[in-house]
Amino acid sequence: MKRITKENYENIVYISHEFQNNPENVIEIETIIKKLQKEYPTYLFISPVHTFGYLYDDVSYEQGLNMTLFLLDTCCDEMWYVPSETSRGVSAEITYCQKFDIPCKPIEM
């Protein structure tokens, strides 16, 4: 078995989507990533909702946001987001990308 590193993927993309502890949002994220994975088979898509969503009621909002921003900053090449006028998290992630020159763009579905 060989070691798997970032070089194994053409791009590592953080998927930003509103969560608000809503199971329907989880299903929508899964649908989006499945479609994107077929369109971009050499990319790795990372969902912070699937990584940290189970902690929604166990950590503060700020702590949860910091965890997701750390994941974004350390693991991913860029962020793609589903535009949302109601999600503080998506807005914070976009602001973070702009401040630290992390490429980000809306997902066009």
What residue spans do the PLM features occupy?
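Conserved catalytic or regulatory cores that recognize and/or transform ribose-phosphate-containing ligands
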Residues: M1-M109
